[in-house]
Amino acid sequence: MCGRYSFAIDDELIKERFGVTVRSAIYKARYNCAPSQPLAVITNEEPETLNFFRWGLIPFWAEDPSIGYRMINAKAETILEKPSYKTAFRNRRCLVPADSFFEWKKDKDKTPYRIHLKNDVPFAMAGIWDKWKDPEGKIIHSFSIITTSPNSLMEKIHTRMPVILREGDEKTWLGQTGPDELLGLLKPYPAEEMDAYPISKLVNDPKNDREEILKRA
């Protein structure tokens, strides 16, 4: 499961790394991104724009938006089998930019860890998105992060990890690509290129959205 992450880089680095237009009036650095919040995504329909969608997928056919609270992650192994995800996987994919994600080790203290790339560059997690219309006609755009089995670093902390795409695979993920090739991208990121360290339990509360939580405990 991936239930929290950070995306706290400046506008210029976002433009340089992801090649997107950033609306400065909307974007701000986020140190503790949490489900149900509007968060940055780059979609296959608008690959040159940084949009803000609600975290927690609401399928277009859902009766109400509450289902989104249970759909923050989609398992790579079953993504083509689940009605909630398979249409979005085929037609509505996105990048979820981040600079780290957080996971809680399954020990007696439930120690939170920050996981990032060793070179400390921002990365993109593989996501899917959808749009849902309420009875009054209001449209909610939402997304889910795809997870896979853990690599050797992550398995010491948790049983799942988000799919982190290679930079060279990001256009393939957003492009008109067949399902077999897409599924081939949904694999664990190499452990030797990642690092993890324990952080403060301040991260447990999404209201603590400040740089302090990224520090080593």
What kind of feature is each model-predicted range?
Residues 1-217:
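Short linear sequence motif anchored by a di-proline
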